[in-house]
Amino acid sequence: MSQFSRRKFLLTAGGTAAAALWLNACGSNNSSTDTTGSTSTPAPSGTSGGDAPEVKGVTLGFIALTDAAPVIIALEKGLFAKYGLPDTKVVKQTSWAVTRDNLELGSDRGGIDGAHILSPMPYLLTAGTITKSQKPLPMYILARLNTQGQGISLSNEFLAEKVQIKDPKLKAIADQKKASGKLLKAAVTFPGGTHDLWMRYWLAANGIDPNNDADLVVIPPPQMVANMQTGTMDTFCVGEPWNARLVNKKLGYTAAVTGELWKFHPEKALTIRADWADKNPKATMALLKAVQEAQIWCEDPANLDELCQITAQDKYFKTSVEDIKPRLQGDIDYGDGRSVKNSDLRMRFWSENASFPYKSHDLWFLTEDIRWGYLPASTDTKALIEKVNRSDLWREAAKAIGREQDIPASDSRGVETFFDGVTFDPENPQAYLDGLKFKAIKA
């Protein structure tokens, strides 16, 4: 298929949560689960009188994915309260489409102020290309929540092929399906989001045109495994713990973890509505400091068991610790006979500058969204990044919590190299685009 149509996008982005999505669009918040209230005693206040937030709380959304842990932990360990935001709500969203809709509503209309989100989405919202109103919704990215920790998995129908990251057997499967009158069905979590871009990159690098040789469908992350079981798709790209759960249930196997595609790649972000942040600058700083501290906590191996026990609860991920813990500590059972221990491709929350929102990474996301027609070729990427990416606030918050030594010197991480040998130079994104075989650029 050439592209997700807007109609198909609106109908499928919520997957089987469509009913909840339409209720939400009408102003109901039934598609979200409020997990307000932590189980821990708040730490001593981290604010002084002059730093006191303008409000007592913020309403944040999250999807049941391991990389939502910093937002959840900031609530559970009393870090929001520590920085003067004791009334903060952390609300489960059923899909990225619901997250989008609730951000558009804002908390004053029953929605949310900010969220754990796919890194490209704040840009697509700010550009107005995915809002239901088709109007721009200015957003800020305050931090990256994690790097790595996603996977591309296949159905057991293709277990004999044992497809890996760079593998001619993948194209053979796609060619066989096309010859039989079908297309390789690949599930992603949101059009133009990270999982969509990882899947498209993987297919294209293996000689498969995502627009003509595959059928990309949208399924919410927590519903991926159930849909694989019913044969909805042949392959999917999603964050943990859902690849691990697929393997644990013996319904499929992981071809590659996304760190194999691009080592230490950026993934989710902490986003906030720009109007909320501009109205509440001290509360925004408090929010950022709390999440940064939570990321540091999540990175500490001593906290791994507690992190898994907290997030496995029904109100958060509704899965087992066994689905979360192994891959989070770098122990990867691919489900096809391969396994690794203590892999450096595990999810990072703070180490290796995981939390810093590099503008060069956002440029790659925008370049890929231009590549596949989610943004027009005329997009002023530099201006859009300067509008959305608030690395200045990240630096200020990191300094305030005593982590000045972790502040990068530059907003660019420099040239990035992908598994197929292709490089992305943020100083020359056009050269990167020009060198790609498969693309669907729109004027």
From Swiss-Prot:
The N-terminus is blocked. Disruption phenotype: Mutant does not grow under low concentrations of nitrate. Mutant is totally defective in nitrate uptake but shows significant nitrite uptake. Gene3D superfamilies: Periplasmic binding protein-like II (3.40.190.10). The keyword Transmembrane does not apply. It is a lipid-anchor. Keywords: Cell inner membrane, Cell membrane, Ion transport, Lipoprotein, Membrane, Nitrate assimilation, Palmitate, Signal, Transport. It comes from the Bacteria. Belongs to the CmpA/NrtA family. Part of the ABC transporter complex NrtABCD involved in nitrate uptake. The complex is probably also involved in nitrite transport. NrtA is the substrate-binding protein. Binds both nitrate and nitrite with high affinity. This is Nitrate/nitrite binding protein NrtA. It comes from Synechococcus elongatus (strain ATCC 33912 / PCC 7942 / FACHB-805).
